[in-house]
UniProtKB/Swiss-Prot annotation:
Residues 1-40 are annotated as: Disordered. It comes from Homo sapiens (Human). Belongs to the ADIPOR family. This is Membrane progestin receptor epsilon. Signal peptide: none annotated. The gene is PAQR9.
Length: 377
């Protein structure tokens, strides 16, 4: 499908200009007629009536006008636009997860108060989950305020996904990885000797891995945000494929759990983690398929403009993946509290998250101030 190369000019719509000799009354009549209709009366636009940066592949109609006011953006969530269900498919999960984390922190009735250091990794993880859904909703609702604000909101959306990914790694590091046989030198050293004949002391290797997990995940979070922001510039031919690939990279932080299931009896020892971990990755594969393939709108452009297009399906399956993740992170927390090691530190949890916020903010600022944004139509 061809794409517009320039935004629609301000004077491309409306009656022709009056002749110089027209009376004042005629000029006033034309001026009144050329005023924008009220928000409720503004029709939705087709793909060739909006700036190129607003056009979604194979989505032909249902576009909102640019610029809209904040009030018009909010009102549009109750109207049949091509962004309406993009909002609701993440706003409803946002409410569900907000309720879930409130119960975990404040209403669980456990012996651990919400401010205990043992719960710091859970706070990091919960903030990532909630921020991701909240930022996605904000980006989809207010993306038609202006071209610059549209870019800013989606940069923030990418940053929130990276923030969530790092928060997940923090939760894994404290709640899930300590329970793996793969990261226990007392288990791995004799295992390698018996299975492979390797006489290797795994103590240093495992210690090195533990020391590098969070720094590497931190660097990946910043790098992924840079790559995704870069994908909104003109050099990127397949931005959706690039963003999908980029956000798959941080999932490698969960490789120890996958290796644990291959080398040891994870299914028998921790069936909750086994089932929900693999089901989560099934949902992620399905979500990636829809995000890259642009099915079903690729098959029948125009039919799924309002309901059923790939981005809505992508939202639904990412929600399901995070739902499963929350389930096994909660189970990992329960096991952690039964025999907790040293309490997580503020600097090793919240401190990392705050530093990441600063770095991601600097990345977004750089891209908003760069000349590449100005060249994007």
């Amino acid at each position: 499908m061809p794409r517009r190369l320039q935004p629609r000019g301000a004077g491309t719509k409306g009656p022709p200009a009056p002749a110089p000799a027209a009376s004042g009354a005629a000029r006033n009549s034309h001026s009144a007629a050329s005023r924008d209709p009220p928000a409720s009366a503004k029709p939705l636009l087709r793909w060739d009536e909006v700036p190129d940066d607003f056009v979604e592949c194979f989505i032909l109609s249902g576009y909102r006008r640019l610029p809209c006011t904040a009030q018009e953006c909010l009102a549009s969530v109750l109207k049949p636009t091509n962004e309406t269900l993009n909002f609701w498919t993440h706003f409803i999960p946002l409410l569900l997860f907000l309720s879930k984390f409130c119960r975990l922190f404040f209403l669980s009735g456990g012996d651990v108060p919400f401010h205990h250091p043992w719960l710091l990794p859970l706070w990091c993880y919960a903030s990532g989950v909630l921020l991701t859904f909240a930022m996605s909703c904000t980006a989809h609702v207010f993306s038609c305020l202006s071209l610059r604000l549209r870019a800013a909101f989606f940069y923030l959306d990418y940053a929130s996904i990276s923030y969530y990914g790092f928060g997940s790694t923090v939760a894994y590091y404290y709640y899930l990885l300590p329970g793996l046989s793969l990261l226990d030198a007392r288990v791995m050293t004799p295992y390698l000797q018996q299975r492979l004949g390797w006489h290797v002391d795994c103590t240093r290797l495992i210690a090195a891995y533990r020391a590098l997990v969070l720094p590497v995940a931190f660097v990946l979070a910043v790098a992924c945000t840079v790559a995704c922001c870069k994908s909104r510039t003109d050099w990127c031919t397949y931005p959706f494929a690039l963003r999908t690939f980029v956000f798959v990279m941080p999932l490698s932080m969960a490789c120890p759990i996958m290796l644990e299931s291959w080398l040891f009896d994870l299914r028998g020892e921790n069936p909750t983690l086994f089932v929900h971990f693999y089901r989560r990755y099934f949902w992620l594969v399905v979500a990636a398929f829809f995000n890259v393939s642009k099915i079903p709108e690729r098959i029948q452009p125009g039919l799924f403009d309002i309901i059923g297009h790939s981005h809505q399906l992508f939202h639904i399956f990412t929600f399901l993946s995070i739902y499963d993740q929350v389930y096994y992170v909660e189970e990992g927390l329960r096991q952690f509290l039964q025999a907790p090691p040293a309490a997580p530190t503020f600097s090793g949890t919240v401190g990392y998250m705050l530093l990441l916020v600063v770095c991601l903010g600097l990345v977004i600022r750089k891209f908003l101030n760069s000349s590449e944004f100005c060249s994007k139509k």
